């Protein structure tokens, strides 16, 4: 199952904090990949994603949760540094990165405020819930903006994305460390079902073979989880009695 072209990776949060972080990561990646707003389709994807990110950021104490996790990861690394044979220089480097990200995040303005106060995002956001509500006659300001020189548009977008850098950088190092905290291990499901103890984990990672065309339906929390494998073709697809897959409980 090591051939990545023949497998697919799924991730599932085991608590609300991780759910929020994965959503933020997804939205930040979408903003980065659609930063070249040279047509209406890319522009609407960018502004719709920015609107979604504003909503996610308003739902909780994002900065506080990230700062707590940055501190927790530093403490975990300190414990690793005391283990014989550990690459102390690597541990120290990671700890310094965590401290640096925490300092930048702590001193940053309110996260997402630049998006919320941006007039163009605000105007577009009001029309997103209306079917077809982003036509040029609905949003003449966007229509004019898209016809500005690309240098002006890029400057506008780069400024918005730069305001999100403290969030993006902190989130990236946190999720990287969590994902690397546990390797994928081979498992077997029986009759499409698998369950186990979560042991206080934050994240499940599953790698499945593409060939059976299956997807996981996961339920769980920090103490226990259950996985049911279902066929993509609900009418004609089948689930093997024994399915080999890889799992990490991070």
Curated annotation (Swiss-Prot):
InterPro entries: ZapD (IPR009777), ZapD_C (IPR027462), ZapD_sf (IPR036268). Interacts with FtsZ. Pfam families: ZapD. It comes from the Bacteria. One of its GO terms (biological process) is FtsZ-dependent cytokinesis. Its main location: cytoplasm. Signal peptide: none annotated. GO terms for cellular component: cell division site; cytoplasm. This is Cell division protein ZapD. SUPFAM superfamilies: YacF-like. Cell division factor that enhances FtsZ-ring assembly. Directly interacts with FtsZ and promotes bundling of FtsZ protofilaments, with a reduction in FtsZ GTPase activity. Belongs to the ZapD family. The gene is zapD. Keywords: Cell cycle, Cell division, Cytoplasm, Septation. It is found in: Cytoplasm.
């Amino acid at each position: 199952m090591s051939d990545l072209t023949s497998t697919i990776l799924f991730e599932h949060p085991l608590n609300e904090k991780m759910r929020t972080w994965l959503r933020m990561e997804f939205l930040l990646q979408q903003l980065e990949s659609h930063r070249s707003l040279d047509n209406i389709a890319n522009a609407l994807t960018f502004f719709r994603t920015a609107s979604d990110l504003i909503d996610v950021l308003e739902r909780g104490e994002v900065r506080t949760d990230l700062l707590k996790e940055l501190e927790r990861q530093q403490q975990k690394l300190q414990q690793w540094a005391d283990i014989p044979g550990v690459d102390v220089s690597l541990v120290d480097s990671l700890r310094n990165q965590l401290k640096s990200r925490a300092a930048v995040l702590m001193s940053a303005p309110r996260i997402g405020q630049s998006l919320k106060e941006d007039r163009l995002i605000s105007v577009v956001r009001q029309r997103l819930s209306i079917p077809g509500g982003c036509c040029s006659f609905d949003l003449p300001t966007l229509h004019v903006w898209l016809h500005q020189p690309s240098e002006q548009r890029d400057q506008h977008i780069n400024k918005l994305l730069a305001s999100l850098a403290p969030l993006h950088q902190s989130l990236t190092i946190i999720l990287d460390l969590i994902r690397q905290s546990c390797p994928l291990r081979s498992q077997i499901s029986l009759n499409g079902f698998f369950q186990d103890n979560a042991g206080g984990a934050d994240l499940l990672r599953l790698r499945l073979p593409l060939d059976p065309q299956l997807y996981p339906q996961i339920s769980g929390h920090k103490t226990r989880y259950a996985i049911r494998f279902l066929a993509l073709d609900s009418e004609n697809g089948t689930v093997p009695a024994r399915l080999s897959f890889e799992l990490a409980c991070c």
